[in-house]
């Protein structure tokens, strides 16, 4: 199982004081050195954390893959074609939200998503769609030509009871198997922590987890190398469980 380290909140800390540090590039390189299989960055329309220059700098510096999260807009499409990341994950975006609140509604935007997917694919960029674990959305993702889906784990991570968490886990598990049976590559992410990652990492249909906020939070106390190492170890151990 692969670990994508999202470094958005390195930029959040930097931007809080308008300094040049901490450096997203340095964070990306440290994460790579200590177990990250790819680096994820979300270039939001309001540039609240990652800036355009960060994306170019990280793409030029890293040795693994860059997974660029972006909204379904012409501006972001143009940026992606300039940066040429290995992967683009199309996500829903609202300016007033604190973080991404739900999955992309592929059914409601099939034509536009299909158009963006073809343009990016023709440029050699692999496209992923960040969606809820809903069979209709998963089928729509396949129909528009996306080879990858990233299942939104936020409802699982934020569940307020054990029963609700189990319900959300089963939804993700079923969605992952459905997507895999359709021939899609399945990733997952959002709200995952060292404390809740194990059940998700046990789902063999899921190939990659993208984790950011909790990793950066842990890094405040452990250091980024140890935070990445512990997460990767937790994922590895989960795969060994019966």
From Swiss-Prot:
Q: Site annotation (Transition state stabilizer): which residues?
A: 150
* The keyword Metal-binding is annotated on this UniProt entry: no
Regions annotated as coiled coil: none
Q: What is its main location?
A: cytoplasm
Keyword Kinase belongs to the record: no
* Pfam families, per the entry: PdxJ
So which domain of life are we looking at? Bacteria
Q: In which pathway does it act?
A: Cofactor biosynthesis; pyridoxine 5'-phosphate biosynthesis; pyridoxine 5'-phosphate from D-erythrose 4-phosphate: step 5/5
Q: Please give the PANTHER family that the UniProt record associates with this protein.
A: PYRIDOXINE 5'-PHOSPHATE SYNTHASE (PTHR30456:SF0)
Role description: Catalyzes the complicated ring closure reaction between the two acyclic compounds 1-deoxy-D-xylulose-5-phosphate (DXP) and 3-amino-2-oxopropyl phosphate (1-amino-acetone-3-phosphate or AAP) to form pyridoxine 5'-phosphate (PNP) and inorganic phosphate.
Oligomeric form and interacting partners:
Homooctamer; tetramer of dimers.
Q: What is this protein called?
A: Pyridoxine 5'-phosphate synthase
Its lineage opens with:
Bacteria, Pseudomonadati, Pseudomonadota, Betaproteobacteria, Neisseriales
């Amino acid at each position: 199982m692969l670990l994508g380290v999202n470094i958005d909140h390195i930029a959040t800390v930097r931007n809080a004081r308008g300094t040049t540090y901490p450096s997203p590039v340095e964070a990306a390189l440290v994460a790579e050195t200590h177990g990250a299989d790819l680096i994820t960055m979300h270039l939001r329309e309001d540039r609240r954390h990652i800036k355009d220059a960060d994306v170019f700098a990280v793409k030029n510096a890293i040795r693994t893959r860059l997974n660029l999260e972006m909204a379904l807009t012409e501006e972001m499409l143009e940026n992606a074609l300039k940066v040429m990341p290995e992967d683009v994950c199309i996500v829903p975006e609202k300016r007033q939200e604190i973080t991404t609140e739900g999955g992309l509604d592929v059914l409601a935007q099939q034509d536009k998503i299909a158009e963006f997917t073809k343009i990016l694919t023709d440029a050699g960029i692999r496209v992923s769609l960040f969606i809820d674990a809903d069979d209709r959305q998963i089928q729509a993702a396949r129909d528009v030509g996306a080879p990858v889906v990233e299942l939104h784990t936020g409802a699982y991570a934020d569940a307020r009871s054990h029963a609700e968490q189990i319900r959300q886990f089963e939804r993700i598990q079923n969605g992952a198997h459905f997507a895999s049976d359709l021939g899609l590559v399945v990733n997952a992410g959002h709200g995952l922590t060292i404390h809740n990652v194990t059940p998700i990492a046990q789902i063999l249909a899921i190939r990659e987890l993208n984790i950011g906020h909790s990793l950066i939070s842990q890094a405040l106390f452990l250091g980024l190398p140890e935070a990445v190492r512990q997460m990767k170890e937790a994922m590895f151990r989960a795969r060994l469980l019966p």
